[in-house]
Amino acid sequence: MRQVIVAVLAGFILAGCVQKFPGPITVKPEPINISEQEVKAKIDNFYSECSKLKDAFKCKRAADDIYKSGDFRSAAIAYDMVCYGFQYIPACKQLADMFAHGDGMPRDIDTAVTIYQIACNNGDNNSCDLARNLRVQNQNR
């Protein structure tokens, strides 16, 4: 009986270890312009919703919805909140991607590298590669 329980628990643990993070957003929407008041209202609403959810995955999905609407400024703030509030690597990577590509903000390679490095230090090997590649590209300019 003990072996069955151990086997079942091992299965649950392994299933949790191989759980995939949501993939990156692959289609970049058209950016929209919104006022500072609209950004503040959207972020206040996001913060309230995310505080109720208390779930990094669901909060990142809500930030993805903001991004997909084309409101990159609000999305960057939302990803920042999820990245640093939950230490949720997919949100950190999306924020770094936004800095690397200049989505809704001036392109900032140094900030992108810093955020990718945070994700790398938390075990995301892809972020290590992205940080290294951006450093090399930046040095060659």
Feature annotation, model-predicted:
Residues 59-68, 94-101, 133-137:
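Hydrophobic face of amphipathic alpha-helices that form TPR/SEL1-like repeat modules
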Residues 58, 91, 127-129:
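TPR alpha-solenoid repeat register
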Residues 17-34:
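Bacterial Sec signal peptide processing site at the extreme N-terminus
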Residues 52-56, 66, 85-88, 101-103, ...:
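Short helix-capping/linker turns of helical repeat alpha-solenoids
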